[in-house]
């Protein structure tokens, strides 16, 4: 667990400083999650060691713990590599724990993918609204949100059960 990762997130990914709506905690997240059920709106996991994602981040119990940490309407976000030998296992376990409510977004960097797991079916999901929000976020933060949205739509055929196309 390296504090430098938080600095990189501020520098490279525009992670804002802590304030009343964001609190970044440096430490072992597993004990924190066990002690704080239903306490998190967005849980982001980006855990790699020299051999890839550590073993304890692959278990069904880990993904169950992640979901139990989320509040109603919370979102789980995990960075994974499509080339990881355990890729199908991660996706299967996330799909089981989040009852099929997952979306995979290729990031444009070969092999790197972001997986979103939803505690509940998201409330506001129509294509027109989401595309407009992606454009606004892209303009505000200078990150490729519209590209991410387009990749999400392209690579998630099951998204049509969560996203409406009639507006």
Sequence positions of predicted segments:
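Generic domain-boundary/flexible-linker signal
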Residues: 7, 54, 87, 125-128
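A generic structural signal for alpha->beta connector loops
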Residues: 19-21, 73, 99-101, 142-146
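C-terminal substrate-binding/active-site "lid" region of AdoMet-derived donor-dependent transferases
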Residues: 60-124
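The AdoMet/dcAdoMet-binding core of the Class I SAM-like
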Residues: 1-72
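SAM/dcSAM-binding transferase cores
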Residues: 113-167
């Amino acid at each position: 667990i390296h504090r430098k990762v938080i600095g990189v997130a501020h520098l490279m990914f525009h992670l804002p400083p802590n304030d009343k709506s964001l609190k970044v905690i440096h430490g072992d997240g597993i004990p924190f999650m066990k002690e704080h059920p239903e306490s998190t709106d967005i849980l982001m996991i980006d855990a790699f060691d020299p051999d890839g994602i550590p073993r304890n981040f692959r278990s069904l119990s880990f993904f169950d713990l992640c979901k139990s940490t989320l509040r109603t309407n919370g979102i789980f976000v995990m960075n994974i590599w499509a080339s990881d030998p355990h890729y199908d296992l991660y996706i299967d376990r996330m799909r089981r724990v989040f009852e099929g409510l997952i979306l995979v977004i290729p990031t444009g960097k070969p092999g790197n993918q972001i997986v979103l797991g939803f505690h509940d079916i998201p409330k506001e999901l129509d294509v027109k609204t989401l595309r407009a929000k992606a454009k606004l976020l892209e303009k505000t933060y200078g990150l490729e949100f519209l590209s991410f949205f387009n990749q999400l739509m392209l690579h998630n055929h099951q998204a049509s059960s969560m996203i409406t196309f009639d507006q």
